[in-house]
């Protein structure tokens, strides 16, 4: 069934930036700025890689994620699926 395979926006976004190796700037709730590419993620954390080093970042500590380049998650000109 199609609903079984549907992903939420967060997973769609993270999977896209992981596959395309899009550089990200991540701001944590305490104001710390992290930069790198996502190499792995699950429901609770993500692995951020930069300069050969990896950081495990818990999602509950993330405030904002900004991609280094524009991304298009969905086909067509709409921002979100209908």
From Swiss-Prot:
Protein name: RNA-binding protein Hfq
Domain Sm: 11-71
Any one GO molecular-function label of the UniProt entry: RNA binding
NCBIfam families to which the protein is assigned, alphabetical: Hfq (TIGR02383), PRK00395.1 (NF001602)
One cellular component (GO) term of this entry: cytosol
The encoding gene: hfq
Gene3D superfamilies: 2.30.30.100
Originating organism: Rhodopseudomonas palustris (strain BisA53)
Function summary: RNA chaperone that binds small regulatory RNA (sRNAs) and mRNAs to facilitate mRNA translational regulation in response to envelope stress, environmental stress and changes in metabolite concentrations. Also binds with high specificity to tRNAs.
Family membership noted in the UniProt record: Belongs to the Hfq family.
One Pfam family named in its UniProt record: Hfq
Keywords per UniProt: RNA-binding, Stress response
């Amino acid at each position: 069934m199609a609903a079984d395979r549907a992903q939420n926006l967060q997973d769609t976004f993270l999977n896209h930036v992981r596959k395309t190796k899009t550089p990200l700037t991540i701001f944590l709730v305490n104001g710390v700025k992290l930069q790198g590419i996502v190499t792995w993620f699950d429901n609770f954390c993500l692995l951020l890689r930069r300069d050969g080093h990896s950081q495990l970042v818990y999602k509950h500590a993330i405030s904002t994620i900004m991609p280094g380049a524009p991304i298009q998650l969905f086909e067509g000109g709409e921002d979100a699926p209908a």
